[in-house]
Amino acid sequence: MTTPTTMTFFDRFEADILSGKKTITIRDESEKNYVPGTTVQVSTFEDGREFCLLEIISVSPILFSELSCFHAEQENMTLAELKSVIQDIYPGIQQLYVVSYKLVR
């Protein structure tokens, strides 16, 4: 397993990441290999435009059914919005991973 050095987000999340309002991302099993303490270059999914560096704080497994208002707050969304976004991106996936991070620059 190689440690990931990049991460992409839909461009609609850029402002929340840069303002510190979004402090986690929820990913599927294909993106569970981020390593706490490492720094990743972040770019937009749509066009690959780099916009910041994030330090990975933790990676924790979670089931879709365990998502709570706490997770939604860290994503700067309501719980209903969060569940809808997750279902759109990862339809039918139950096992997910919470990647917590902090903005480096």
Regions found by a protein language model. Name each.
Residues 2-105:
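Structured alpha/beta reader/binder surfaces that contact nucleic acids or chromatin modification marks
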